[in-house]
Amino acid sequence: FKEKKIMSNVSGVKSKQIVFGTDTDAISAAATATTLALLNSGPWVNAQTVTLTSTGNNAGITFVVVGKDANGAAATSAATTGPNAGTVSVAGTWTEVTSITASGSITTDISAGITSGATTGIIFAGRTRVRSMTGVAGGGAGVVFIKNGSATSGQNRLILDVDSGSTIDPYISDDGLLCEDGAFFAYAGTAVVGLSIQFDG
């Protein structure tokens, strides 16, 4: 007889980032273009507060952010007054940014960043399998949860203890973690700095 090897279906694998902490130029490095050049603009699992930072006075112009809100729906911010030698936050929370545009010429440089990342989030709202995750830990310790159906009350599909300074790369079987009712993320602690999650989408 012939042996047949059955492989898991991993077509259509997507990736999302989980980010914690404050980084004033995570989304866009300091520059003077009225349409900011985006770097790491998502998609993020955990919704982020978007910030604008400048060493100059940009209070005379406004900025509009376009992207996706905490629920993954298309969103456009209200006009946000620019910073005056400091940092200002854009209203709402965001899982992705597709553009940041100024109403006029920028004085000195403007950078866009993130702060206050949520401790829960949606990996994928429908039936999916989480395939892998990789990341780095900072100081402290924490616990990462992958849940089915809800970030708060869903059944745990993975519980991962994270130690200070450790590499986050847990073993996940070839079949992945099946989340019939959607894959959700929850986190408790201070150790995780950044995490990338791959899933069927």
Language model segments and positions:
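Surface-exposed, low-hydrophobicity beta-strand/loop segments enriched in small/polar/acidic residues
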Residues: E3-G201
